Amino acid sequence: EYQRVLDLYDSAIWPDESSFYLDIQNAASILARLESSNVNVGDRWEHLAKTSEDRKGDHVLMFTEPHYTMALGSAKKHSQIDSQIESLTQHAKISPKSNKHVIENLTQPICRAIQDFYKGNFKSTVDLLMPLRYDYQPIGGSHAQRDVFNFYLIDAAIQSGQLILAKSLLAERVAVHTNSYGSWEKYAHVCAKLGDQKNASFAQSEVSRLSRQLH
């Protein structure tokens, strides 16, 4: 029911192109998750990128920063991301020690990873996110909200041809998110590409099970 999600995005999630940072954050997360499921989101990123560009330099919440990067990266505004990351560097210099640590060790690497993803530098995305994937908590947001970073990691592993890593990440994911249609679908695809027919068949049976439940 992806069209229904897009309709909700337009009518409730980001109906008036709000510039409130939490609205931008939520909108970017939805679009990123939809695109990870191969859903065409139209020109929605372009509109969100313009609003994100206007928020550059406010640094209200470190968790929101990567969401600005998502919007800017999707719209190919990489010079704006470079400016965003440089602004974060300057902000870190005047921040308390704890916030400085978050900026330098989480916010900036995640922003760079997302920028690299949209540049097609998928291996760099993997290299940046892999060491952080169990340590996102200090950046803020809920566990479910931070999970969007794992979408980038898994997709980058697949796109960079690191299928054994992708299989491992997806196996870990479906063990926890047993009703995640998209995760099972990707797991089936990766296992099939690796010649693991047993796990590919099982994953495909889970896709079929969830499809029946959805319809």
Map each language-model feature to its residues.
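Helix-coil-helix junctions within alpha-helical repeat/solenoid scaffolds
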Residues: 1-212
